[in-house]
Amino acid sequence: MKTKIFSFAFNRPDILQYQITSLKKFIVGEYDINIVYDTRDNQYYEQFKKICDDNDVVFHHHLSEPGGTPSFYNAQAIKWVYDTVISKEDDCYVMLLDHDMFLIDELDVHQEMSVYDIIGCLQTREKVKYVWPGLCIFKKSSVEDIEFDFYPQTVDGQILDTGGGTYKLLSNEKIKFMDTGVDYPEEYKGIDLKDEKITG
């Protein structure tokens, strides 16, 4: 089954090439890369479009509604892609990424998803659980009949950030979820995007 990768960018065209290169280097199996440029002013339109064209990846242009918060803008762009692109696809794995997430090792999505419907970075607010969409993979057929969204919201008195609406997925007993977790080392040194072992 093909993996459809969607990276959501709103600034920093200078790092997009590194993300695309790392994805092409480390994703195992059949995949498509989609870059979603979410903007209100089109400041970086030409730069993002050229990088996508040069790398033969799909470019989506989303004009978000002004007056929101960064979390709302991000959720609005993800929902737009889900409704206008993903919902029309054949069954596939869908990977959602922030524009500043980079693979640093091989990732076989088909193998990782063999027994799960969703994998991603779990967010917990008291008893409410949801998935952060900056690092998330789901099987389209597993979630398409469940009503959910990616917007921040308040649930059981808890304030949920971007991806908050995915609590409906994790509270569904049919969904098998794996938390990828996030390990924070005592001293974070970052990664060198110019290191050819990482980004070619």
Q: Where are the model-predicted features located?
A:
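Active-site-proximal specificity loops/subdomain of glycosyltransferases
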Residues: 41-90
